[in-house]
Amino acid sequence: LGIIIFQKPHSHAKISKKERMQKFLLNEVGFNKAQLNSYDSLYKTHERSMKKLMDSLRNGSNENFSVLSESGFSDSAVQEAVSRSAAQNVRMGKLFFEQLNQIRNICNNDQKPRFDTGIAKFYFKKEKSK
């Protein structure tokens, strides 16, 4: 019974982030087929980089908790864990914004203003009121 209640029909399946971005680039920015192909290639490279970073984050989190446990959650161990986590978050943010810049570099001069004004809306669109 629980499976039936919580199973979503295929027609309402969520669109992947990649597909949403492709639609944005095609419909809002005006990408052509060659530009979309460049984006696809860039996406694959970015996805591999993010996977490596996420694996590193998981390993780092495990290590942080081990160090915290072994030290009895000392102030210095907590500070070290915070510093490691912050550095990993900086790397993730850097990868994200570098990818946006690389996508922007695929745009021609006419498309760049549309990308610049639309990208924030793409990532931070307001929820519709119910």
Residue ranges and their predicted role:
Residues L1-G2, G30-N32, N37, N108, ...:
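Proteins with a high burden of low-complexity, intrinsically disordered sequence enriched in S/T/G/P/A and R
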Residues L1-K17, E127-K130:
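Classical N-terminal targeting signals for secretion and organelle import
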Residues P9-E28, F96, L100-N101:
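Extended, structured, electrostatic nucleic-acid-contact surfaces
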Residues H10-I15, K51-D55, A87-M92:
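A short, ordered amphipathic alpha-helix with a cationic face
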Residues K17-R84:
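Extracytoplasmic/periplasmic/luminal assembly and interaction segments
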Residues S41, N62-K130:
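Non-cytosolic head/periplasmic domains of membrane-anchored proteins
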